[in-house]
Structures are given as C-alpha cells and as structure tokens.
From Swiss-Prot:
The name this protein goes by in its record: NAD kinase
Gene name for this UniProt entry: nadK
Pfam families: NAD_kinase, NAD_kinase_C
The protein's required cofactors: a divalent metal cation
Residue sites binding NAD(+) per the record: D72, G73, N146, D147, R157, R174, D176, T187, A188, Y189, A190, L191, S192, Q247
Amino acid sequence: MQSFNTIGLIGRLASASTQYSLKRLIAFLTDQKLEVLLDKETSTILPDCDLPVATRPELAQACDLIIVVGGDGSLLSAARAFAGHDVQILGINRGRLGFLTDISPEDIENKVGEVLSGRYLLEQRFLLESTLLRDDEVMSTGLALNDVVIHPGKLIRMIEFELYIDDEFVYRQRSDGLIISSPTGSTAYALSGGGPIMHPNLDAVVLVPLYPHTLSSRPIVVGGNSEIRLIVCENNNLNPLVTCDGQSQTMTQPGDTVFITKSEKRLKLIHPEGHNFYETCRSKLGWASHTGN
C-alpha cells in the first residue's frame, strides 16, 4: 500500500464538533512527524492554528492524502475538487449519516493510524458529468459523485422533459424531476425517491423519476457507459434547474439539452481495513442484524 507523506485537512465549517476533531487530528499527525497542510476555507474555523494554509488546487498538487472531517456533503465537495488527481481521500464523520465519511470521531487516532501504516482499503468511484447545451453551445458543465438532478427548483410545479438513452427515445414525462445517480449516490437522494441500492463496484447508473404523473414510470438501471440525454420541453412555464450533488446548479431554458455521462475522472476513496458495504447499510439504514430464530 502507498505510504503518505503530505496530508491535507478539510473540515466542515461552522461546526464546533468538527473543530474539536480537527484539533485532535492535527495533534496526532504532527506527532507522527508528517507534513500537514490546512485547507484555506477550513483555516477560518481554526484561527489559532499555525499550519501552512493552501487552496484546494494547491492541496491537489502537494498532498498524497486528503482527510475530510465532516459529513457526506463535505466529502462530496472534496470529491469534485480532487477527482482525477493522484490523491486519496479519507473521511471522518462529523455529519449525520456518514456513508462516505466512515471513521467515527472516537476512533480518529486508532483508525487514521492504521491507514498511515498501510492497513486500508482503496476504492475507485466514478463520477457523473453533466453538460448543458443551448443552440449547440455549451452553457455549463458539472461533476457529481452522487447524482445529477433536474427539478423545478423552489416552485411546486411539474416540469416536462424527454429522455433518451444512447440516442433511443425512452419517454416524455411530466414529473417533479429526474434523479440520475451513480452507485455511490444510490444510498442518498435516489434511495429516498424509491430507487434501488447498488453496490459501489457496479458499473451502472440508475434513473429515478420524482413523482411522475403516471402510474407506470419506475426507476431504470442502465450501463455505466450509457449516454443519457434530457430535452427540456418547450411548453414548460418555468426554468428547470440541473443540480450536481445538491451543491451546484444551473438554470435551463425550454429547448435546452442536458447530457449526462460517466466522467473519465475517478475518486480514490479510502476505507479503514475491514470496511464492509453491507455492514454500513445495516448500521446507517437500520437493517435488522439478528440472524437467530
């Protein structure tokens, strides 16, 4: 396993618990005589810290390990910044569910120490890439580790769009939107929308309709290399939004085309040794664990 020499730290902002965990982590890493860099935004919640400060592009170039202290949202933001770079990501959970940030705050020294000694599992997660075209001109692009969603925004009104997969017409739909999710995102918003749980190793994408105005529209699982194309219908009375991971969004206009494909970029995600996807599902989703009669 790769050894780590330069470690970047990113923390969830406006969180006292994150501050506490970051201070513990910094003390532990400096005791190990490792070079530690602090994310520029994160430095605002640690004003007394004397670590070198770096922007995320600078962290991507200088570090071989990024440790994110926060929730899944913090890790999603880091994923888009560091995917495609030769840097690995480790998460410490200071959020709510913590599907991606799977080290407990109580185990920081123990579990991070195991990772530093080479005892960890490495996964390569693919991201989705969205491209918005208007009159054959690229208006915006976006990356998502979890999902790309087309939706009406703040207004409680249905939108209408056409769906094509690999240039084949699938349907024209009126609904509250559509979730296009990676396997990583299948335990997030897509799950709430009634989509299936997909193992992270699957090379697949799931499309989950949001409250479709039909009784027969169900989630569709397609191959990971599929090209998904959405056409915003002309008769929409609003401007649907396209959102990546619930964190970045762009506004569409009637007649726009949105392409969603698998990105060439990969996220190198680290888990502690012994990590088990199904155990994570049991603990995070409240599945029964009793196997006796």
